[in-house]
Every structure is written in C-alpha cells, then in structure tokens.
A protein has these predicted regions:
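Solvent-exposed interaction patches of small proteins and small membrane subunits
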Residues: 1-88
Length: 88
C-alpha cells in the first residue's frame, strides 16, 4: 500500500471515530451546534481521504495508463469524479 492510500485509510478511520462520536452526541441529547460542528469535521476528513485517493490514482493509475497508450480512459474517470465534486 502506497503512502497516499495509507493516509486515506487513516483519515477514514478518523472519520469513522468522529461519526461514532456524533451518534453518541445525538443519543445523549447534546447541543445541536456542537453536533453540526462535528459533522463538518467528519465531512472534511472524508473529503481529505477522497483527495488522497484521487492523488494516488493520478500519480499511479493514470500515469501508467498514459505510458501504455490508453490514458484517456483514466482521465475521463477523473473528470467524472471531479464533476461530481464540483456539482455539490
């Protein structure tokens, strides 16, 4: 597993812990603004992990495909993901 994937995995594990904490906050009847702030933090961690995975994809999968002469498929995949990100 390369460094980007290791970092993405750690970010996802952190987000999972944050989400578990958010669930507990809701169950405990905690203040809504505090819950909302934690949701933003978990969301940011998920976005970070996605960026790391896309970085890994560009640095390895897309580069390898381009060297083998079929990089346009991989580029189209990345454009599809970026379109989803920008539409939100």
């Amino acid at each position: 597993m390369n460094e980007e994937k290791k970092q993405a995995l750690q970010a996802l594990k952190t987000a999972r812990g944050q989400i578990d904490g958010i669930i507990k906050m809701i169950e405990d009847g905690r203040y809504c603004i505090d819950i909302s702030n934690q949701i933003f933090a978990a969301s940011a961690m998920l976005k970070r992990s996605n960026l790391l995975i896309l970085k890994q994809h560009m640095n390895h999968c897309v580069l390898e495909a381009a060297q083998e002469g079929h990089g346009s498929e991989k580029i189209d995949e990345v454009i599809g993901i970026l379109t989803k990100v920008l539409e939100k």
